[in-house]
């Protein structure tokens, strides 16, 4: 994998879990050239942000992107690197016109890093591959398609308290072998609610043929999410608790045929396992996984197996890890919460995984 201009290896970058706001803005705010009222640009009175807007440019770079002024807060006082004004202007033009996906240069005053992947780079097992798969999953979920990830072509990473990836990948429709260039903007967010891993998407789309004509990038609307899906992740629900629960109609016990039909349940399970063992191994080291039981809970008005189609849902998954990094096969429990705000391309996935003997 080749990094353009003074690479920063992803493995060497850690996400701070002490910062609760990244200060990113959306495309429409960028074009408006000023903060819209009520957009939450200042957080003096807000200590409990639930969802972050990652998008592709920070507030500090707003004036630079629009007026090409020197970036505010991005230059190290001890950094003597001089940026060619023409190169800087081209850099921000590429960001603006491609929504942050097609950037082939880097300037030392920006925190954006550009990576081009070789055909043999296997990124499915690291966080970039996971984010690409999540983005494609949500595109399929919303479009009713069945595209499969072939490989990641390139990605841009941006660290500003959170790690955001603008990923360009190749996908295929196995029904007719049609190939597509897929784009997704995914953020690995700070963990706030007793979860092990939190992933948010803002863009999940086929690359537009003409730059600037794709799905519009919009901020997350936290107010649109039901309060029941906010706060800390719920505790594991036992069969005894379920039997005495007054809201049994909100639950559905997933059948084996459902698991085969909805392969994203396997994806959720793999990511949950990854969140437990991250740092010890790559995702491919913990598969295959054997799903033993899945219970889905939602307040949305779906009957029986249709509950799997709910945008807002909580999944209780018990599974066995065959290739655990320490010792023999182990049984696990995972809690996965999926929330949406009604904006196309937006989904938030929170993962918590436990060993059953802990």
UniProtKB/Swiss-Prot annotation:
Residues 31-82 are annotated as: Disordered. It comes from the Eukaryota. Residues 58-67 have a biased composition (Basic and acidic residues). Pfam families: protein_MS5. Belongs to the UPF0725 (EMB2204) family. This is UPF0725 protein At4g29550. It comes from Arabidopsis thaliana (Mouse-ear cress).
């Amino acid at each position: 994998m080749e990094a353009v201009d003074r690479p920063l290896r992803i493995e060497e970058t850690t996400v701070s879990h002490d910062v609760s706001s990244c200060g990113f803005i959306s495309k429409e705010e960028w074009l408006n050239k000023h903060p819209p009222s009520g957009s939450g640009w200042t957080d003096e009175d807000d200590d409990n942000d639930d969802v972050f807007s990652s998008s592709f440019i920070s507030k500090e770079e707003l004036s630079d992107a629009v007026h090409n002024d020197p970036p505010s807060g991005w230059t190290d006082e001890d950094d003597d690197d001089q940026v060619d004004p023409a190169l800087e202007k081209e850099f921000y033009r590429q960001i603006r016109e491609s929504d942050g996906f097609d950037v082939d240069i880097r300037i030392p005053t920006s925190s954006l890093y550009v990576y081009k992947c070789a055909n043999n780079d296997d990124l499915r097992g690291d966080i970039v591959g996971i984010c690409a798969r999540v983005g494609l999953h949500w595109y399929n979920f919303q479009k009713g398609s069945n595209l499969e990830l072939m490989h990641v072509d390139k990605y841009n990473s941006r660290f500003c308290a959170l790690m955001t990836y603008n990923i360009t990948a190749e996908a295929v429709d196995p029904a007719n072998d049609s190939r597509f260039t897929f784009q997704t903007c995914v953020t690995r967010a700070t963990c706030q609610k007793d979860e092990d891993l939190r992933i948010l998407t803002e863009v999940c789309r086929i690359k537009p043929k003409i730059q600037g004509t794709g799905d519009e990038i919009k901020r997350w609307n936290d107010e649109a999410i039901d309060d029941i899906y906010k706060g800390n992740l719920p505790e594991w629900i036992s069969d005894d608790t379920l039997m005495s629960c007054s809201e049994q109609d909100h639950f559905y016990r997933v059948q084996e045929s459902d698991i085969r039909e909805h392969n994203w349940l396997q994806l959720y399970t793999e990511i949950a396992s990854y969140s437990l063992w991250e740092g010890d191994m790559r995702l491919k080291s913990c598969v295959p996984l054997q799903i033993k039981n899945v219970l889905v809970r939602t307040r949305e008005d779906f009957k029986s197996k249709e509950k799997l189609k709910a945008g807002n849902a909580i999944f209780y998954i018990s599974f066995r890890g065959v290739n655990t990094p320490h010792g023999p096969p182990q049984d696990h429990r995972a809690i996965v919460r999926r929330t949406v705000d009604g904006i196309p391309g937006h989904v938030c996935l929170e993962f918590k995984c436990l060993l059953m003997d802990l």
